[in-house]
């Protein structure tokens, strides 16, 4: 379902429009002015996908029905820096849920695997109450400092919380 103005609408997903057919979650929609398109990044079958549309309410379609890379990953968040460089933050299942970043191709359809860099791994006591989980990344930039906001611990634990790390580069290192 979606909200347009004060009206609720329902969008049925057409299986032919995207990779995968189960476990859809964590969609984020971005408008890229340069392309005059909306990009929806989402997780499906524990893979990262991106679909495009001319409207923020869709329909969204994948021209090529495949993930942005083959490794299982979730919780994507796009960040385009002031110089136009696109970065994708996401969770890899490397010793728990760990937040990583990679530069994207200019068309925003693939990550550049040679640029993969670890950002945040659950290490602080509050992050380890039930599981090694750092997830749900989002990046903001203010006055030359990058802020990576994330959730940590297991979502079913009362200690599930929000943390942040800072860096002078979108690729880290994050402190």
Question: Where are the predicted features?
Answer:
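Asp-box/WD-like beta-propeller blade repeats and closely related beta-sheet repeat scaffolds
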Residues: 46-82, 92
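Hydrophobic core segments of beta-strands in well-ordered, beta-rich domains
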Residues: 18-20, 24-45, 77-95, 99-102, ...
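Short loop/turn segments immediately following beta-strands, especially the blade-tip
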Residues: 51-58, 102-112, 165-175
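Loop/turn-rich, solvent-exposed surfaces of beta-rich toroidal or solenoidal domains
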Residues: 132-175
């Amino acid at each position: 379902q979606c909200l347009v103005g004060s009206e609720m609408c329902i969008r049925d997903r057409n299986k032919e429009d995207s990779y995968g057919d189960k476990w859809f979650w964590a969609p984020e929609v971005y408008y890229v002015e340069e392309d005059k398109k909306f990009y929806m990044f989402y997780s499906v079958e524990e893979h990262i996908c991106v679909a495009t549309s001319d409207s923020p309410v869709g329909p969204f379609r994948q021209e090529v029905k495949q993930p942005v890379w083959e490794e299982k990953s979730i919780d994507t968040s796009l960040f385009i820096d002031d110089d136009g460089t696109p970065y994708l933050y996401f969770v890899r299942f490397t010793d728990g849920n760990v937040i990583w970043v990679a530069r994207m191709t200019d068309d925003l359809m693939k990550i550049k695997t040679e640029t993969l860099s670890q950002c945040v791994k659950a290490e602080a006591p509050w992050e380890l109450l039930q599981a090694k989980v750092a997830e749900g990344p989002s990046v903001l930039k203010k006055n030359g400092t990058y802020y990576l906001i994330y959730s940590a611990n297991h979502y079913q634990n009362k200690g599930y919380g929000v943390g942040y790390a800072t860096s002078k580069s979108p690729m880290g290192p994050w402190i």
